[in-house]
Amino acid sequence: MRNAVDIKTLADVKEKVKHEKRTHCLVLNKYRVNELLKNKDAKIWFLNIFRFPSVLKFREYQGCLVETGPYDGEVLRFIHSYVESLGGGEVSGQVSGQVNDQLSCQMTSHANDSQAGTPLADAPLADCRLIPLNARFNRALHELMQREGKGVLEGVDMRPEEGDERDVAAEGGGVEDVAQQGAAHQDAPPALEKLLRVIKAEGIQIRTIQLQFGYDNMNTSQVLRKVFPSESEVIHKYEMIGHIAHLNFCERFENHKKVIAEIILDKNKSIRTVINKKDSLKNVHRTFTIELLAGEENYLTMLRENDIKVKLNYELMYWNSKLKKERDRIYSLVENNSIVVDVFAGVGIFSLHLSKKNCLCFSNDINLHAYNFMNVNIKLNKRRSILTYNLDARAFVCMLLRLGIFSRDTSTLAMQLGEQNWRNVSLDFVNSAGRDVVDAGKGKKRAADCKVDCKEDCKEDCKEDCKEDCKEDCKEDCKEDCKEDCKEDCEVKDCKAGDSHQSNSHQSNPHESNPHESAPRDKKKKLAHGDANGPLGERPPGVAATHGGEEVPPEPTNNEAEQKAEDAPTNETHQVDINLGIYGDVHVLMNLPQTALDFLDVFRELLHMYSAGQKDPQGRCRRDQMRNVFIHCYFFSKPELFYEHAERNIRMQLGGIPREMKITEIRKVSPSKLMYVVEFNLKDVFSQGDQLG
């Protein structure tokens, strides 16, 4: 047997994990197998090994039967006598008479079995099947026979291997109860008694068989525990990101990490890439150095979470599948028609979730690649109420403060959208309280909408969009609409359908003149990107973003989908009005545990604007004019100091502490480092915060 230190390749692993198992097996006619397999009392005693058949053909495993002399006959006679002592019936000779005769002959003259023309080589044996029994049966049988002064054959396995457990309940208790009942009572467990009665009643034979198992009969966890039996924390759990398996190896596995990765890759067909994190997340973009251990070097992946498709490049941006429970918790916490501010959004997963609850979402990330994939995922999931930004966190929050989304008095949000956010949102959707009515019409396109898309398809700059949006049954209409005699009709319909989705009305060539576009619109105004009243905060691709003032050059993207020229937004901007009267509380998500608490100081300005000690000209308290602003701020801390750590930082950054705050443990990063989230209503931060100047 090889030691773990000798394991260098997958071939070494396969050699090490080979093992044999000697056990009893039932021999019966193949026509009775299905009936026996349906017997739940008998089924719990059958051998259950990963990717190993429960029923074996006699001829294929004939060579695995063990020479035991008179032992098999003694076991069978013991079973018959035991059942008779319980009041069992006679053996049925109709069902398996041939099997009984042939195997009786075999037990008395086993030494001649290998000779040609013996009963084992006769044709009727093709009707025989073997059902191996597990170690639990061997142990229970051994306890029964010991009371008669007998024991089972030496070498028969008594210890169940991993994977040899069934959770099928027997009469009077589960599987573990069955194993204990034999020791507690003089008689056999009820489930075993029922199997023994079946053996006698059906004329089933008992034989001893030695089976060989190996790498193919073990799952990933079993293989790793077999290779590293002395390790209490063998890596058998890992984070899955689409087709990527992400492991964090400690030093003691340094020499074996590649072979462990090969095992994981080989045992899991959905995995194509296995990586190791070489350092911690210390840079602004929350990325780490990837070490490829096995598989293909492909970090562009797709995953699903709660019916949401998420596309990302794991090498260039942050993602943590372990936070799914936390995302679900936030989803259940946030009410419908809330305003969501995700300061460190990554690929936008919080907003993608919460937009399903008709929330107006503002998502920001300083990482340009994360920002680009955020927009990709919005389009992929057909979300229509998410505005995306690529800004420093403080600049992002300051932008929202100037927009006035935290004020109860702001009924209409007037803002300018760049081309990307113009594509992301639907004004009809975000300004409608009855969203279900809007969503109900998404199933099929109306004929007029198809013709509008057809006209756009004829133009060179919109071919890609039409390939995605036009259905197969509309393609013939597209060809017809491109003809000269249909152009006028398309233009008229284009004007009429302009309100159905704003992206259709701005994809045509801006240099073309259209007499039907002269009608002014109150909600939409086009401005040059360099206009003094240009969009607040929306950063065009290529402009550097910072958290601390330093310039962060964008990283190369390896020709990803986000770099496609046809998807790049133009410099055109749009004036829009959003009805904030239909939205309620504000939820600010700050999922950057390393430094998120340090960013709370950006809300000092908001506390000063709505100081509890000030009144407006009508005599109303300024603080009452502020929406409920619920902060969800994540942080790392030692488990014994988490509350003091949060309270100290909140007091330092905000100049006061809230009346109430809730701290929830999210996950264990290491024994001395846990992730928490502190949650409070910014509106309830008083005392020193009232005196901020």
Curated annotation (Swiss-Prot):
Going by the UniProt record, its keywords in alphabetical order are: Cytoplasm, Methyltransferase, Mitochondrion, Nucleus, S-adenosyl-L-methionine, Transferase, tRNA processing
Subcellular location as annotated: Mitochondrion matrix; Nucleus; Cytoplasm
Per the record, what are the reactions this protein catalyses? guanosine(37) in tRNA + S-adenosyl-L-methionine = N(1)-methylguanosine(37) in tRNA + S-adenosyl-L-homocysteine + H(+)
Residue numbers binding S-adenosyl-L-methionine: R327, D365, I366, D392, A393, N591
Q: Where is the composition biased (Low complexity)?
A: 500-512
Query: Which EC number applies?
Result: 2.1.1.228
Here the disulfide bonds are none
One of the protein's GO biological processes: tRNA N1-guanine methylation
Using the UniProt record, name the top-level EC class of this enzyme in a single word: transferase
**Known InterPro entries for this protein?**
MeTrfase_TRM5/TYW2, SAM-dependent_MTases_sf, TRM5-TYW2-like_MTfase, TRM5/TYW2-like_N, tRNA_Gua_MeTrfase_euk
For this record, an example GO cellular component is:
mitochondrial matrix
Pfam families named among the record's database cross-references: TRM5-TYW2_MTfase (PF02475), TYW2_N_2 (PF25133)
General function of this protein: Specifically methylates the N1 position of guanosine-37 in various cytoplasmic and mitochondrial tRNAs. Methylation is not dependent on the nature of the nucleoside 5' of the target nucleoside. This is the first step in the biosynthesis of wybutosine (yW), a modified base adjacent to the anticodon of tRNAs and required for accurate decoding.
Provide the assembly information. Answer: Monomer.
Family under the similarity heading:
Belongs to the class I-like SAM-binding methyltransferase superfamily. TRM5/TYW2 family.
Q: What is this protein called?
A: tRNA (guanine(37)-N(1))-methyltransferase
Q: Which organism is it from?
A: Plasmodium vivax (strain Salvador I)
